Amino acid sequence: MKLEKEDYIEPDCVLCGKPGEEAAAKPVPVGRILDKLREYEDRSDWEAVERHLKYWLAEAEANRDERGQLMLNNELMGYYRKQEKRDEAYEHADRAVELIGKLGMEDTVTAGTTWVNAGTVREAFGDPVGGLAFFEMARANYEKNLPESDARVGGLYNNMALALTACGRYDEAESMFRRAIAVMGKQENGELEQAITWLNMADAAEAALGAEAAEETVEEYLDRAEELLNTESLPRNGYYAFVCEKCAPVFGHYGYFAAEAELMRRAKEIHERD
């Protein structure tokens, strides 16, 4: 097994230095951290992801690098959300939001992204109202600072739609879902995000209309999602496997058992290969 630096080097000591001397901030190597993170994610090595992020967060804290801490808390809240660890996700979300204010970054796109991430954490753990509060802040930020074709805008619209659905605001949710699909259609490999959104729309239609009344609409949305997931040009990497695993149970819920099995087979094949 290859040892990484974080496996054997202790974080810098925050108390080291001359008495009474305040150490200057020392930035952590963000590019290298993210490159290694994506490598672990592509291999679906989630234990390595956690170890890697926690190591570098300790480094950023020891080195008084608050911008580095912001980036790492953003990554950690997303990691713990995917691992369904509520307390840890909330802890890092709250810290990231706090750092935005401390750094005076409220008017930056980074702030918008942090609010999206924090809202997604709250929506994921059953607080759609709290999620929407962050999403509205992010929407004002993004629509001011980003072109509407930016993938981050599409991701925000999708997350807002999920929270609106959970709040029973179905018409607003459908409008947001369709905005998300339009944006993602302009992205390279955007088929995966579009597929997820069509499946989210199927769930929203069932919630709004009831299973029987929504049947035809749900079938249309599932067929569109399946076609997108079958796009041959999509890279068969760790993220593709993650999306397959995320989407498969939705197809199973609606009786598309062959599609469910095929998606799980693809995910397993990728994991075994990597």
Language model segments and positions:
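Short coil/turn linkers that connect adjacent helices within long alpha-helical scaffolds
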Residues: 23-24, 62-65, 102-106, 144-148, ...
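Alpha-helical segment of the N-proximal tetratricopeptide repeat
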Residues: 26-63, 78-82
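Residues that mark the junctions of alpha-helical repeat units in TPR/alpha-solenoid scaffolds
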Residues: 29, 49, 62, 69, ...
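Conserved alpha-helical positions within TPR/SEL1-like repeat arrays
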Residues: 31-42, 70-82, 109-124, 151-166, ...
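Amphipathic alpha-helical segments of tetratricopeptide repeats
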Residues: 54-59, 95-102, 139-144, 178-186, ...
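Short coil/turn linking the two alpha-helices of tandem helical-hairpin repeats
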Residues: 104, 119, 146, 188, ...
